[in-house]
A protein has these predicted regions:
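Short, Lys/Arg-enriched N-terminal segments with co-localized hydrophobic residues
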Residues: 1-12
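Short structural boundary motif marking the start of a folded domain
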Residues: 13-19
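Short, contiguous acidic and Ser/Thr-rich linear segments
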Residues: 32-45
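Short strand-turn-strand beta-turns centered on an Asx-Gly dipeptide
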Residues: 39, 86-88
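Ferredoxin-type iron-sulfur electron-transfer modules in oxidoreductases and energy-metabolism complexes
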Residues: 44-66, 105-272
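Serine/threonine-rich, repeat-prone extracellular segments and beta-strand-based repeat modules
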Residues: 72-76
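Charged interaction scaffolds used for protein-protein
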Residues: 94-96
C-alpha cells in the first residue's frame, strides 16, 4: 500500500509551481535570481503570484526575502503599468494566466527602459517622445468651446483601434531598433501621430508632428521588423500606422522641398 504521507507530498507537489524572478535592488547593484514555490489555484495570473509572494516572501529554499517591486493598477489590461518580460516575451502580467505558461515561469523587467527596482522600470522615454511629437489635441483656454468638428464614420473606424494604446512599452521592448545606441521613438508613438493627424482638430498641427518624426529617432529608424504588432496587447495595427505615417512624411518632405518652410500649401493636410 502506498504511504499516505508520500501521497500527500505528491499531491502538494502537483499543486505547486515554480516562479523564477530576476531581482535587483538598485540599478548599480548586482542581479540575483530568486525562486518561489507557489500554490496553484484556478484562474491564477502573474499579479496574484506576486501578491502571494508579498504575503509570504520566502524563497523556495526557505530563505526570507522581501516583497517583489512591480507596477500594476487596473488589472484589466487597460493601464499598461504591469508590462514585464514573462518567459522571454514582453506582455501584461494581469492577463498572463499561470495555466497557459510554461513552467518554471520566468519574470524579468523590460530591458529597453532604465531599471528602477526588481520589475519596475522608468518609461519616461515614451512620454517624452509623445511630448516631442505633440500627441495631443490643443485647445485655447479651459472655457466651453462648444461642439467640435465631426469626424466621418469611416475615419472613426480607423481611429478607434489606434486610440486603445495603453503606453505599456511592449512594442519598444521587442523592437531591435530600440537600444542604447538609437533615439528611435518606437511604433506606439508613430501610431499616435497617425491618430492625432487623423483628428479634425489635431490635423491642424500635423506638420509639426511630421517634422518631429523626420528628425533623429524618427520614422526613418524603423527597419520594418514587424515584431511590434505581434506583442501589442490591444491588437493595434502598428505596421499599418508606420506605413501610413511614412507616406505622410514623404508628402510633407516633398512639399517642404518645393515650397520651403512656412510656405507649403495645405501644410496641415495629410493623405488618407
Amino acid at each position: 500500500m502506498p504511504c499516505p504521507a508520500s501521497a500527500r507530498v505528491k499531491e502538494m507537489a502537483e499543486n505547486t509551481f515554480i516562479v523564477r524572478i530576476k531581482r535587483q535592488q538598485r540599478p548599480d547593484e548586482a542581479v540575483r535570481w530568486e525562486e518561489y514555490e507557489l500554490r496553484h489555484r484556478p484562474h491564477l495570473n502573474i499579479i496574484t503570484c506576486l501578491r502571494d509572494i508579498a504575503e509570504k516572501p520566502y524563497t523556495r529554499d526557505g530563505r526570507e526575502s522581501t516583497p517583489v517591486s512591480y507596477e500594476a493598477n487596473c488589472l484589466e489590461e487597460v493601464c499598461g503599468a504591469c508590462a514585464m518580460v514573462i518567459n522571454g516575451q514582453p506582455r501584461q502580467a494581469c492577463s498572463a494566466l499561470v495555466d497557459s505558461l510554461e513552467k518554471p515561469i520566468r519574470l524579468e523587467p523590460l530591458t529597453k527602459f532604465p531599471l528602477v527596482r526588481d520589475l519596475v522600470v522608468d518609461r519616461t522615454h515614451m512620454f517624452e517622445s509623445l511630448k516631442r511629437t505633440k500627441c495631443w489635441i490643443p485647445i485655447d483656454g479651459t472655457y466651453d468651446l462648444g461642439p467640435g468638428p465631426r469626424m466621418a464614420p469611416a475615419k472613426q473606424e480607423m481611429a478607434y483601434p489606434l486610440s486603445r494604446c495603453i503606453t505599456c512599452g511592449n512594442c519598444l521592448e521587442i523592437c531591435p531598433k530600440v537600444n542604447q545606441h538609437t533615439q528611435f521613438v518606437g511604433a506606439a508613438i508613430i501610431s499616435q501621430v497617425r491618430l492625432f493627424n487623423m483628428h479634425p482638430t489635431g490635423e491642424m498641427h500635423a506638420a509639426e508632428r511630421l517634422e518631429a518624426l523626420m528628425g533623429p529617432g524618427g520614422i526613418e529608424d524603423c527597419d520594418n521588423a514587424q515584431n511590434c504588432v505581434k506583442v501589442c496587447p490591444k491588437g493595434i495595427p502598428l505596421t499599418e500606422s508606420i506605413a501610413a505615417v511614412n507616406g505622410q512624411v514623404i508628402v510633407h518632405a516633398i512639399k517642404s522641398w518645393f515650397f520651403g518652410e512656412g510656405q507649403r500649401p495645405g501644410a496641415g493636410e495629410v493623405p488618407e
